[in-house]
Amino acid sequence: VAAYAICVRDGQLLLARWTDGRGRPEWTLPGGGMEHGEDPYDTVLREVEEETGYHVEVTGLLGVDSFRLTTRSRFRRPVDRQGLRLVYEARVTGGQLRPEIGGSTDLAAWHPLETVPGLDRVGLVDTGLALWRERPVTGRLPQKMNTA
C-alpha cells in the first residue's frame, strides 16, 4: 500500500524523478510506500516532504488505484503482486523545493500541466491527473489507465 499526492499550483504539477529498473529516469507523483503501522494520510505527508522538501496539507482523497504486477523472481519463478495506491490532493503550506537525499528519487520540480504528456513518466501520473480532473464519486476511474 502506498500514498501519493497531486499538488497543482498556478497551473503546474509537482513531480519527483526516479530511475526505473532499466536505469531510465521517469517522473512520478511524490509519494511512496507505507511504513509498518503508519496511516496512509501520514505516509503522503512524510513522502512528499522527503521527496520534495515541501510540507503539504491534504485537501482531499481523490481515489484508489489498484494494480496487479506479474514479474519473475531472481530464480525465474513467476511472482504475482497486487498493490493499492491512494491518491490524495494536497497543497503546499511550507518548506523549500529540494531533491531527496539518499532516497528513491533524485529531483523534484514543477511542470506546467500542458507539458506533462510530453514527459517520460510512470502511468500513475496520468491516473492521478485523471482522478484530479474527473473527481469520480467512487474514487475509481471508469476504465483502468495503467498497470504500474
Residue ranges and their predicted role:
Residues 1-14, 33-36, 87-89:
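Conserved N-terminal beta-strand and adjoining loop/helix that marks the start
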Residues 8, 22-24, 29, 56, ...:
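Short connector loops at helix/strand junctions that flank enzyme active sites
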Residues 14-15, 98:
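General beta-strand recognition
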Residues 22-24, 97-148:
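Nudix hydrolase/Nudix homology domain
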Residues 67-97:
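Active-site-adjacent beta-strand/loop module that shapes the phosphate/pyrophosphate-binding cleft
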Residues 29-62, 88:
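The catalytic Nudix box helix
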Residues 13, 59, 81-87, 108:
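Structural motif
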